């Protein structure tokens, strides 16, 4: 099927991202696989091509606004869902080493199919809850960067994500532009976990106000965090 990629390329140009024809085709294949699988599995409420481009692909890639992604960073995408932002980041920035984590295995089966179809390297999936994975030596404090577009309170997200990050690394949360109060309410939790709010960068994609909340990991997270499965969401720090 032919797609009008003019809006996609315009948005890429505004982010100073230059993709090869092969990379653009990888995005198109990803879109087709997403829409096809969405017929039998709830992956996205957005299915129109230009909307998926803007609200999923470009929103994911906008991370370039706050960090240089053209380098060999190890990235954990926690609560990846349909693969955002991890797969768009991997397509556009092949040097990245990416792990996609989710608690729902059938999503990861789909993402493994995408990874195989797009012939992506140095990207894999892991099934489990953040509270359990963060206690495993294989993952704890092992990533340069943890990212999440998951819809959750920042205090809860911080308890999920910060323990995965190396000291000196960052946790970056994708939020709406109206996040200042949420960030202020999360500062205590962030500090307990060894982090510090480094930057809040606001921007617009189409008619949506968006923000990146960048949290720098200054010291090792206490071993008692994250707490047992279910506790961080029910009783935020």
Give the positions of each predicted feature.
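Conserved beta-strand signature within the Rossmann-like core of class I S-adenosyl-L-methionine
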Residues: 168-178
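Conserved SAM/SAH cofactor-binding pocket of Class I
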Residues: 61-150, 158
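Short alpha-helix immediately C-terminal to the canonical SAM-binding loop
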Residues: 107-109, 179, 183
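Short glycine-/small-residue-rich Rossmann-like dinucleotide-binding loops
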Residues: 150-151, 176, 219
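Helix-to-beta-strand junctions that scaffold the AdoMet/dcAdoMet cofactor pocket
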Residues: 93, 165-167
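Residue-level signal for inorganic ion chemistry
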Residues: 34, 89, 175, 215
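SAM/dcSAM-binding transferase cores
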Residues: 184-237
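Class I SAM-dependent transferase core
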Residues: 1-72, 76, 112-123
């Amino acid at each position: 099927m032919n797609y009008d990629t003019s809006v996609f390329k315009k948005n890429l140009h505004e982010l100073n991202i230059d993709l090869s024809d092969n990379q653009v085709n990888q995005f198109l294949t990803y879109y087709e696989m997403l829409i096809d699988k969405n017929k039998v599995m709830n992956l996205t409420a957005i299915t129109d091509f230009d909307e998926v481009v803007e609200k999923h692909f470009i929103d994911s890639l906008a991370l370039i606004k706050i960090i240089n992604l053209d380098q060999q960073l190890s990235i954990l995408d926690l609560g990846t869902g349909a693969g955002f932002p991890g797969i768009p980041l991997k397509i556009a920035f092949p040097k990245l080493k990416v792990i996609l984590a989710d608690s729902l295995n059938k999503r990861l089966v789909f993402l493994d199919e995408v990874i195989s179809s797009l012939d992506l390297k140095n990207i894999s999936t892991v099934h489990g809850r953040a509270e359990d994975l963060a206690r495993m030596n294989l993952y704890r404090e092992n990533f340069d960067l943890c990212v999440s577009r998951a819809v959750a309170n920042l205090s809860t997200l911080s308890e999920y994500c910060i323990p995965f990050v190396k000291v000196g690394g960052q946790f970056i949360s994708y939020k709406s532009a109206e996040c200042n109060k949420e960030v202020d309410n999360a500062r205590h939790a962030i500090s307990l976990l060894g982090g510090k709010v480094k930057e809040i960068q606001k921007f617009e994609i189409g008619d949506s106000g968006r923000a990146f909340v960048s949290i720098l990991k200054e010291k090792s997270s206490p071993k008692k965090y994250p707490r047992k499965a279910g506790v961080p969401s029910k009783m935020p720090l």
